[in-house]
Amino acid sequence: MQTSLTIHDRILRIQTLLEEKKGEDIEVFDLSGRDYIVEKVLIVSAMIGRHSHALLDHLKTELKPQGEIFYATEEESEDWLIADLGDIMIHIFTPNHRKKFNLEEFLNTLIASKA
């Protein structure tokens, strides 16, 4: 089963679920029409490493029964977790790792270069 919601509605649902579990500084990047592997990237900060796993577990628990497919997850480091939903990529960072890797700058540059 796969969800029949639009990508916009799926993003809103993901944001709501992350906010329910105290995910912070949620940003969404629209990469539609760009030379990138997904249409949307969502970045969220977790308070600490264990919180990262709690956020990802909450997403899986709530979204899988609704038809969302998690094609892959990267969970080796609690400082940076990744969930691949096919056309949406979710990055869950601890604040220090989010600042260190500054994925937002890369994504904004990618968006601006194709404007």
PLM regions and their residue ranges:
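Switch/connector loops and helix/strand junctions flanking conserved nucleotide-binding motifs
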Residues: 99-102
